[in-house]
């Protein structure tokens, strides 16, 4: 038995401007070198860009985008008897949200363009329409899980 205490989940404080925990998660994942004000500026201007491009509520678009990118299953490597198997496992809710936010930000960074806020806004808009690289990443993950379904009985 492990002697460590169980992982403590902490309550997520909503951001002061939009009062949305999802926006807070976006800000925290964009964060680099502890410069939260810069990441807030990037996310808030991305939300403003979304609001200018689409006449819907930008928070609903962000929520839809993150929901569309959440994977149902993922691949985990499991070493059994000297060989490593790619075992498909279900994704828990919090991990799914975290993965989807990470993928959206990762693929926003590698998009062509100058400002990160524009690239993030475009990636979120594409993800809300089931397009873009983050959706492709989710589909690739699902294909890998389907291909390795034979090893599902090795689940953790």
Swiss-Prot record:
Annotated keywords: Chloroplast, Plastid, Ribonucleoprotein, Ribosomal protein, RNA-binding, rRNA-binding
InterPro entries, A to Z: Ribosomal_uS7, Ribosomal_uS7_bac/org-type, Ribosomal_uS7_CS, Ribosomal_uS7_dom, Ribosomal_uS7_dom_sf
Pfam families registered for this protein in UniProt: Ribosomal_S7
One GO process term, biological-process aspect: translation
GO molecular function: rRNA binding; structural constituent of ribosome
PROSITE patterns named among the record's database cross-references: RIBOSOMAL_S7
Subcellular location per the Swiss-Prot or TrEMBL entry: Plastid, Chloroplast
GO cellular component terms listed in the entry, alphabetical order: chloroplast; small ribosomal subunit
The organism's place on the tree of life at top rank: Eukaryota
Gene3D superfamilies found in the cross-reference section: Ribosomal protein S7 domain (1.10.455.10)
Location (main, coarse): plastid
CDD domains cross-referenced by the UniProt entry: uS7_Chloroplast (cd14871)
Keyword DNA repair: no
Described purpose of this protein according to its UniProt entry: One of the primary rRNA binding proteins, it binds directly to 16S rRNA where it nucleates assembly of the head domain of the 30S subunit.
Subunit structure: Part of the 30S ribosomal subunit.
Family statement: Belongs to the universal ribosomal protein uS7 family.
Protein name: Small ribosomal subunit protein uS7c
Chain's gene name: rps7
